[in-house]
Amino acid sequence: MVTAYSSTPDQTDHTPFITANGTTVRDGIVAANFLPFGTKLRLPKLFGEKIFTVEDRMHPRFSNTLDIWFETRAQAKQFGVKITEAEIL
């Protein structure tokens, strides 16, 4: 399952623009609890050849989910929830 988030206080901790890995959020960042930081992946059915990097974590209850960072809450809501395959690089 793939979901989306943005840097709003209700979706993050007290440092909404810093990832769990200590980097600044940017396009191409994903949160995942089941992959190590730095893992590169693609979501070809949704984003073609675009490469994402795991730099963030989610609440522990989301064990097999990828959460894509979007710049705005509206973009994250528009993306919604998708079921797709991830290609680990």
Give the label of every model feature segment.
Residues 1-89:
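Solvent-exposed, well-ordered loop and adjacent helix/strand elements within mature globular domains
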